[in-house]
């Protein structure tokens, strides 16, 4: 039974799931909008919002914490110096999920996930 299970497994092993979320997070930070399946988008929202909250502090410890999660210098710098300052006055709700279509091959619900631009 699933009672209060804290996250979606997405049909993957633990390491595969963490790699997937890391790669999706890098993609959304670089392009600010991506299309993926709805369950992945919902799981990614939680992951990215925690990163942005950490990055908002802007100090070297925040930089290290974000880099530990993303393992990508370019993306970490963009998140800490460009993306996070936009959300300085916003308490959460940094992303938006918009349902788009049903994928033809497997009827998976697709959605855009994007960073909210004020």
Curated annotation (Swiss-Prot):
GO CC field: cytosolic large ribosomal subunit
Keywords annotated in UniProt: Ribonucleoprotein, Ribosomal protein
SUPFAM superfamilies: Prokaryotic ribosomal protein L17
Single GO BP term: translation
PROSITE patterns recorded: RIBOSOMAL_L17
Top-level taxonomic group: Bacteria
Gene3D superfamilies referenced in this protein's UniProt entry, alphabetically: Ribosomal protein L17
A single GO molecular function term of this UniProt record: structural constituent of ribosome
Keyword Ribonucleoprotein: yes
Cross-referenced Pfam families: Ribosomal_L17 (PF01196)
Family: Belongs to the bacterial ribosomal protein bL17 family.
Subunit structure of this chain's protein: Part of the 50S ribosomal subunit. Contacts protein L32.
Protein name: Large ribosomal subunit protein bL17
